[in-house]
């Protein structure tokens, strides 16, 4: 199994609910290590650049508005198959379809306010991590 890194964002809805610690506990219980982390209030430009892949999608404007609506917690997770493991923890994008016990089933409000973001592939993870963390700020442990 490969040790990977993935980007995770705890979105404004989950930050506002004060469940950061509960989400971190799930990461750690699944064998994922937080190797970089910071809280930020994204600017419109940062959110638009981060989600640029969705620029032509009908939900893009609402997604950007949501992501700049409050602080987010951004972290790099590291571990065996970190990308797939994190995606399992998150659950389906639509919390109504997410399996019981997943982050989205337990903490998300809607398909828009869905608590967390996670990289979907190794190539995406590299690009997403670089958006928020220079390599000097990431510390394997």
Curated annotation (Swiss-Prot):
One GO term of the biological process aspect: UTP biosynthetic process
Predominant localisation class: cytoplasm
InterPro entries for the chain: NDK-like_dom, NDK-like_dom_sf, Nucleoside_diP_kinase, Nucleoside_diP_kinase_AS
Pfam families assigned to the protein according to its UniProt record, in alphabetical order: NDK
Active-site annotation: 117 (pros-phosphohistidine intermediate)
Entry GO terms, CC: cytoplasm
Chemical reaction(s) catalysed: a 2'-deoxyribonucleoside 5'-diphosphate + ATP = a 2'-deoxyribonucleoside 5'-triphosphate + ADP; a ribonucleoside 5'-diphosphate + ATP = a ribonucleoside 5'-triphosphate + ADP
Listed EC numbers: 2.7.4.6
Compartments (UniProt record): Cytoplasm
Superkingdom of the organism of origin: Bacteria
Example of a GO MF term: metal ion binding
Classification via PROSITE patterns: NDPK (PS00469), NDPK_LIKE (PS51374)
UniProt: ATP binding residues: 11, 59, 87, 93, 104, 114
Names of the cofactor(s): Mg(2+)
Keyword set, alphabetical order: ATP-binding, Cytoplasm, Kinase, Magnesium, Metal-binding, Nucleotide metabolism, Nucleotide-binding, Phosphoprotein, Transferase
Functional description taken from the UniProt entry: Major role in the synthesis of nucleoside triphosphates other than ATP. The ATP gamma phosphate is transferred to the NDP beta phosphate via a ping-pong mechanism, using a phosphorylated active-site intermediate.
HAMAP family referenced in this protein's UniProt entry, alphabetically: NDP_kinase
Family: Belongs to the NDK family.
Subunit-level organization: Homotetramer.
Protein name: Nucleoside diphosphate kinase
